[in-house]
Amino acid sequence: MEIAEPVTVRCSTLVVRGDCILLCRRPTTDIWVLPGGSPRRSEGAWECARREVSQETGLAVTPDRVAFVLDATSPKGEQHLFEIIFSATEADPSATPCGTEDGLAPSFVQLDALRDLMLLPPIGERLRAFIERSPDRVAETASYLGNVWGTIPEPASS
């Protein structure tokens, strides 16, 4: 029996302000990522995305819809990531992101600058195209169904 390799589940959020996108920079490596992280036990993807944005940037958001779902395997195969990226609405569009988590520096970055950044996973052009094609970030997205696992019904008695 083959043992499955671990897959990291990540819930991220796409927050757009004008022609800028919210990203978090890891200063030690100069890698940029969307704000996000892995869900806690019993935490839905939507809740995880909202919590991670708050923890990493200090901003309050409400995820709207699924913008992307992706698989990413690192070039050497040492990491496999499954990521759900939600579009989101800010509670206060004038709030300034602040680094609340060690090792991350959040900021709004111009869409035109995405091509010059080390964004991981490397989806900068897809993000840019999505935002330009869908300014309201609702068109061409999928619905998030949440936790659909219900209780198993008892068998009918004969």
Identify the residue ranges that each predicted region occupies.
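Short, well-ordered strand-loop elements centered on a beta-strand within folded domains, enriched
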Residues: C20-L23, A95-G99, V138-E140
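Nudix hydrolase/Nudix homology domain
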Residues: D30-W32, E101-S158
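Unchanged
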Residues: P39-T62, A72-I123
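Conserved Nudix-box catalytic region and its N-terminal flanking loop in Nudix hydrolases
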Residues: C20-Q55, W149
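Short charge-dense sequence patches
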Residues: M1-P6, P35-P39, S74-F82, P153
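N-terminal strand-loop-strand
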Residues: M1-L34, V61, R65
